[in-house]
Amino acid sequence: MVDKAAHILLVGVGGFLGSVARYLVALWMAPITAVFPFATLTVNLLGSFLIGFISELALSTSLISPSTRIFLVTGFCGGFTTFSSYMIEHSALLRDGEHLYAALYLFGSLIGGFIALYLGIISARWMAG
């Protein structure tokens, strides 16, 4: 029971930090997000990379403990990335008739997310030797 309580706390603290980091990225990128949701795309692609990188390191090395993985992947990356923001921003682009931007956002998020995840895995394998 102690491990579960500790893991819940790790997820909560990681989620808090990830959410704050996402908000800071949104503030930082606000000047360039008037037409296209660059901030959400950025955090989702970076989060995909981090999830791939951290998960691969946790699986193939002893550099990341199970508790650290829970904190970083489930907590931080879970709070940092945001599917709900992606969905509302995508529907707003469609509603506003910005079909080209909507298509770029859709494919950039999906394909870019898979590429970022794979690059994270490759980077972790390279780092692990």
UniProtKB/Swiss-Prot annotation:
Keyword ATP-binding: no
Keywords for this protein: Cell inner membrane, Cell membrane, Ion channel, Ion transport, Membrane, Metal-binding, Sodium, Transmembrane, Transmembrane helix, Transport
One Pfam family this sequence matches: CRCB
Protein's cellular compartments: Cell inner membrane
UniProt note on regulation of activity: Na(+) is not transported, but it plays an essential structural role and its presence is essential for fluoride channel function.
GO cellular component, one term: plasma membrane
One term of GO molecular function: metal ion binding
Function of the protein: Fluoride-specific ion channel. Important for reducing fluoride concentration in the cell, thus reducing its toxicity.
HAMAP family linked to this entry: FluC
Homology family: Belongs to the fluoride channel Fluc/FEX (TC 1.A.43) family.
Name of the featured protein: Fluoride-specific ion channel FluC
Organism of origin: Chlorobium chlorochromatii (strain CaD3)
Lineage per the UniProt record: Bacteria, Pseudomonadati, Chlorobiota, Chlorobiia, Chlorobiales
Gene: fluC
